[in-house]
């Protein structure tokens, strides 16, 4: 079958966008490039893979898991059922952290990524901040295996620790500690495709969604350098509660909440107060 015939076939199984996304991924081209190769005959093995993937989509599997990777900040990350699918909004968190490093005036920045999942945040920071020392932490051995594959594919030299937050992390000082922890309430309604496919360990943060923030902030102080930044992704309604938790454990700080591109409170930044 030709590219055009497969696109038409795919539209009968899923959305036009998903059909093109799948096919372009397997042909290793940009979706827009499909229009330039509509008459191209597609290898039979790719055709079979494409058709089987369309069936997986009909079973309400996330397209990122079906393809097996996702683009994040211009980098390709392997994803599977053991890791949360990196969201576009998290790229904004990375951008803000990179911007902050300009104020540090320091060559070798030490960064800790807590609950790293696929490694999207920590590995992206390492790819941008070449001289930084990055440590990625996750409680899930399976998630760390995915993160290690991504580090290898991206040729990034980082450290991995299997740990329940700080429990196995050696006491060292970090300039930046970043985390996108589970923050969904246990009784919160979420999309079926998310609930049925992405790891619950990476989604749910207890009755009020704040358990992980409490655990992190209760133990974070000894790991902070004299000049530091903490960066968290949060649920859009959690700003005030997290401010309270931060202020319970840390003094002489500045807290900033930033909105994402959709105008939602989604990022909190904590740094030492500058006189």
Regions found by a protein language model. Name each.
Residues 67, 161-164, 234, 259:
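Short loop/edge segments at beta-strand edges and connector loops
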Residues 92-191:
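Conserved SAM/SAH cofactor-binding pocket of Class I
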């Amino acid at each position: 079958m030709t590219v055009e015939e497969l696109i038409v076939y795919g539209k009968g199984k899923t959305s036009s966008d998903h059909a093109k996304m799948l096919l372009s991924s397997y042909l290793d081209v940009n979706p827009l490039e499909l229009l330039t190769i509509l008459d191209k005959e597609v290898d039979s093995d790719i055709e079979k893979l494409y058709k089987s993937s369309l069936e997986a989509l009909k079973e309400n599997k996330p397209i990122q898991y079906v393809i097996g990777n996702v683009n994040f900040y211009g980098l390709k990350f392997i994803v599977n059922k053991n890791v949360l699918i990196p969201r576009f909004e998290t790229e904004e968190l990375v951008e803000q952290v990179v911007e902050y490093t300009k104020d540090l005036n320091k060559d070798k920045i030490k960064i800790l990524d807590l609950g790293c999942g696929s490694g999207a945040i920590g590995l992206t920071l390492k790819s941008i901040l070449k001289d930084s020392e990055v440590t990625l932490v996750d409680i899930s051995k399976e998630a760390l295996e995915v993160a290690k594959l991504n580090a290898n594919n991206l040729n990034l030299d980082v450290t991995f620790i299997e740990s329940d937050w700080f429990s196995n992390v050696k006491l060292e000082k970090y300039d930046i500690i970043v985390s996108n922890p589970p923050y969904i309430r246990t009784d919160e309604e979420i999309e079926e495709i998310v609930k049925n496919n992405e790891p619950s360990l990476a989604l749910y943060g207890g009755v009020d969604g704040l358990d992980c923030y409490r655990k992190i902030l209760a133990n974070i102080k000894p790991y902070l350098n004299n000049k530091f930044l903490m960066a968290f992704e949060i649920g859009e309604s959690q700003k005030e509660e997290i401010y309270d938790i931060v202020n319970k454990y840390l003094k002489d700080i500045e807290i900033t909440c930033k909105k994402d591109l959709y105008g939602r409170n989604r990022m909190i930044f904590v740094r030492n107060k500058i006189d």
